[in-house]
């Protein structure tokens, strides 16, 4: 598996094989029965199955028992899971957590993965809450929203702004056992219901400084993956969820197109010329966006493997291709629903779920129009806004 994982191109061992296909079939069946949406989180046995497959150790360094996969290999795995269910793919995407945790002291990282390279991390960053500096570290109190996957996490991270007198230092993330945080089930949305992106509440917990880090800080790991643009990767693992959802929508439409009889007596969907035109346009749009997405990843990864810094113009394409993929995916899912007619409007319709899930992906702050503004500025030779690269 290792040699395949290190390849820059997709089609890795993590995204294929009989055991993985069986896992996806199970996730798909349970999603269609409404299990994840109804309970508003991914079931613990599914998280355990993700662990067994290697979702959470995929990007962990080999020295800690991980697989050290490439960004493309990881993204393709998340895309395949998202094809089975968008919420499951979103939760699985937090297997990218080594990107964040790499900024912890090396001894802390070793302790986390010494317990298990399959450790599941989740958390809420915003808004950073003021933390009192006390003996032994930081005393933390607060509430954090959008803590996706926290119901199945082993450890969680919360955003803090340490208070030094009347001054607040740089925002940090504090890492603590899941048992020291309370989850308030506030996640009630039109899509991605199964992500369980509830509120995290922490009350009077002291966290040692060695269990905190500045988000986006210099990594303390030197494996190739940790030279890949971290903010770009954080966006990519989410936008690739949209690509998987959109592919599921087109596959669902194709499966129903020949057998569906119109109540008006019109020809089957597959026999309608305008439907043929529209589905071809949707396929072209999705395949083009996907190609741009993976091409950008591979180009950046080539620089990493060569030992060179990733140029800013390449990083710009990572950000642009990521937002573009999410936007196109949502449009494609909606096109598939439109072509399905009234069939696609029922709550139990997989197409309806695809549309809602894909739209929620586009609502993430990473996928806003500001990406296009920054990318366009760079194409004109101007500087992007702070925090873009």
UniProtKB/Swiss-Prot annotation:
This protein's UniProt keywords: Monooxygenase, NAD, Oxidoreductase
InterPro entries attached to this UniProt entry: Acyl-CoA_DH_C, Acyl-CoA_Oxase/DH_mid-dom_sf, AcylCo_DH-like_C, AcylCoA_DH/ox_N, AcylCoA_DH/ox_N_sf, AcylCoA_DH/oxidase_NM_dom_sf
Substrates-to-products reaction catalysed: (indol-3-yl)acetate + NADH + O2 + H(+) = 2-hydroxy-(1H-indol-3-yl)acetate + NAD(+) + H2O; indole + NADH + O2 + H(+) = indoxyl + NAD(+) + H2O
Enzyme nomenclature, EC number: 1.14.13.235
S-adenosyl-L-methionine recorded as keyword: no
Highest taxon of the lineage: Bacteria
Induction behaviour: Induced in the presence of IAA. Expression is probably repressed by IacR and exposure to IAA relieves this repression.
EC main group: oxidoreductase
Annotated SUPFAM superfamilies: Acyl-CoA dehydrogenase C-terminal domain-like, Acyl-CoA dehydrogenase NM domain-like
PANTHER family associated with the record: ACYL-COA DEHYDROGENASE, ACYL-COA DEHYDROGENASE YDBM-RELATED
Annotated function: Involved in the degradation of the plant hormone indole-3-acetic acid (IAA). Catalyzes the first step of the pathway, the conversion of IAA to 2-hydroxy-IAA (2-OH-IAA). Can also convert indole to indoxyl, which spontaneously dimerizes in the presence of oxygen to form the blue pigment indigo.
Additional observations: Transformation of P.putida KT2440, which cannot degrade IAA, with the iac gene cluster confers the ability to grow on IAA as a sole source of carbon and energy, but not the ability to chemotaxis towards IAA.
Protein name as annotated: Indole-3-acetate monooxygenase
Source organism phylogeny: Bacteria, Pseudomonadati, Pseudomonadota, Gammaproteobacteria, Pseudomonadales
């Amino acid at each position: 598996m290792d040699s395949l994982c290190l390849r820059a191109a997709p089609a890795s061992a993590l995204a294929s094989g009989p055991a993985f296909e069986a896992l996806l079939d199970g996730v798909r069946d349970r999603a269609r029965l409404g299990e994840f949406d109804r309970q508003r989180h991914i079931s613990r046995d599914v998280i355990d199955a993700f662990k067994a497959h290697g979702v959470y150790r995929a990007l962990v360094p080999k020295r800690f028992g991980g697989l050290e996969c490439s960004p493309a290999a990881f993204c393709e795995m998340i895309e395949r899971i998202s094809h089975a269910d968008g919420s499951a793919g979103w939760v699985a995407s937090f297997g990218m957590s080594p990107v964040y945790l790499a900024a912890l002291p090396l001894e802390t990282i070793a302790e986390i993965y010494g317990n298990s390279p399959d450790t599941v991390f989740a958390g809420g960053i915003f808004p950073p809450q003021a933390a009192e500096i006390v003996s032994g570290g930081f005393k933390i109190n607060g509430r954090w929203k959008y803590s996706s996957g926290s119901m199945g996490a082993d450890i969680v991270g919360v955003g803090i702004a340490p208070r030094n007198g009347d001054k607040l230092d740089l925002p940090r993330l504090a890492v603590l056992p899941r048992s020291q945080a309370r989850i308030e089930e506030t996640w009630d949305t039109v899509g991605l219901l199964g992500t369980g992106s509830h509120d995290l509440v922490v009350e009077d917990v002291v966290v040692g400084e060695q269990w905190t880090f500045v988000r986006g800080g210099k990594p303390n790991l030197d494996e190739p993956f940790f030279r890949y643009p971290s903010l770009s990767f954080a966006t990519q693992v989410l936008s690739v969820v949209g690509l998987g959802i959109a592919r599921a929508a087109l596959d669902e439409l194709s499966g129903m197109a020949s057998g569906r009889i119109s109540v008006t007596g019109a020809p089957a969907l597959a026999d309608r010329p305008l439907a043929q035109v529209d589905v071809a346009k949707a396929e072209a749009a999705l395949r083009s966006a996907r190609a741009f997405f993976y091409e950008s990843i591979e180009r950046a990864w080539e620089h990493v493997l060569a030992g060179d810094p990733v140029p800013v113009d390449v990083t710009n394409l990572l950000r642009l291709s990521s937002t573009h993929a999410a936007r196109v995916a949502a449009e494609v899912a909606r096109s598939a629903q439109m072509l399905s007619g009234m069939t696609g409007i029922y709550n139990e319709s997989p197409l309806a779920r695809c549309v809602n899930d894909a739209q929620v992906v586009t609502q993430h702050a990473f996928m806003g129009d500001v990406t296009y503004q920054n990318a366009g500025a760079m194409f004109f030779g101007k500087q992007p806004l702070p925090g873009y690269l």
